[in-house]
């Protein structure tokens, strides 16, 4: 794979699609800043003291306009940053160009191959001979996974001289990961150990990545402290819910121009993401059906006036299918073959394994017709009818549209800044062990408060007597940790 790192006139490394888009990216970044009060407040509060001075931060998170504002907040606080995207389709090329020119090393472009994607991840981790980053901002856990798999392979190599075998897995993406690690062992058999020893901690953005972290914690294999940003209330109850409520119909309409009203739409999963998607489809006039494994979530859906059925009950009747589960094997080839002609199938979970893309791609005689980028019609030979797959089964709101709007991402990314500051400021205190942590309630409330003025909201103030009556401080936090919002 003949990819070469390029350099700006100032010597900053990068690899993006088109640097001539940098001015366009800068204009949109300036618009987004006005819609991201939490990040701008973080610059005002922490910028003068430069708390990240000397810190090297690697980020693996969708390289969008909103992420550009996050990156420039980290650099405004003193950090050096190297960045890649966490999805092959989610990069906004003008955003990548603007950041590469002005602020940080970026390795990302829309439409990467899987090999290019992991090359970009490697580059974002490559801080030269001194080791890896001090801090990681992760989305989905791929960067964290690469370090952990690298350390595991180096330990096996040290004991037995055995290289990892890419042919030991059927997973095409994991084959690439093992190939990267194998090649790295030939030049530096301690590369990932050096990274592991340097990393102070990681802050993880998504449900999928958080699951990976908790699994590693349970197995005793987590190599450094982690902060679970996803489960901050001001992330999961806003980004996951209201963000998806905005960006799902945006992606559907940009990709297909379909009229949602009157259609039958199936939402697989009724967590925060599923709730946002179901609300958007219902408000657009669709008849929404939910599939669920959890009786509590299923009951919530019925209380919202939604039908709860199995996929098998409705697969031949629905017009739109949306997976939101974070699990695998939700819509399989047999389901797709039973769907209506031109049924729309898409995913707004994290990875591409909620929809059986491998089964579809390898089905004998199936024909793929690309309508436009990230919108494909797959025609089955048995019936000569087809289905429309968006973003190749990956995140359709970022592949077919521009993802969540700036304001709601300001909530999520302000949590990221606070998490990174917390890890960095406590790096020598021993406060954080090799475990997964959630930010405390008072910081969650602070993030929310930073976004109220922009919306014209005014908070009521408790009196001392009122605060004493409900046993909370006058200035908060106002809810116990176990409170369900």
From Swiss-Prot:
List cofactor names only: NAD(+)
What InterPro entries has UniProt attached to this entry?
Adenosylhomocyst_ase-like_sf, Adenosylhomocysteinase-like, Ado_hCys_hydrolase_NAD-bd, NAD(P)-bd_dom_sf, S-Ado-L-homoCys_hydrolase_CS
Show the catalytic activity.
S-adenosyl-L-homocysteine + H2O = L-homocysteine + adenosine
Per the record, the similarity remark reads: Belongs to the adenosylhomocysteinase family.
**Residues noted as binding substrate in the record, renumbered to the chain:** 64, 139, 205, 235, 239
UniProt xrefs under PROSITE patterns: ADOHCYASE_1, ADOHCYASE_2
- Name of the gene this protein is made from: SAHH
Which Gene3D superfamilies does this chain map to? Answer: Adenosylhomocysteinase-like (3.40.50.1480), NAD(P)-binding Rossmann-like Domain (3.40.50.720)
**Superkingdom of origin:** Eukaryota
One Pfam match: AdoHcyase
Entry's EC annotation: 3.13.2.1
The alphabetical list of record keywords is: Hydrolase, NAD, One-carbon metabolism
User: Which protein is depicted?
Assistant: Adenosylhomocysteinase
**What does the function comment of this entry state?**
Adenosylhomocysteine is a competitive inhibitor of S-adenosyl-L-methionine-dependent methyl transferase reactions; therefore adenosylhomocysteinase may play a key role in the control of methylations via regulation of the intracellular concentration of adenosylhomocysteine.
Ligand binding (NAD(+)): 206-208, 240, 269-274, 292, 327, 348-350, 397
- Pathway involvement of the protein, from the record: Amino-acid biosynthesis; L-homocysteine biosynthesis; L-homocysteine from S-adenosyl-L-homocysteine: step 1/1
For this UniProt entry, the molecular function terms from Gene Ontology, in alphabetical order, are:
adenosylhomocysteinase activity
Per the UniProt record, the source organism is: Lupinus luteus
Q: How is the cofactor bound?
A: Binds 1 NAD(+) per subunit.
GO annotation, cellular component aspect: cytosol
The biological process GO terms on file are: one-carbon metabolic process; S-adenosylmethionine cycle
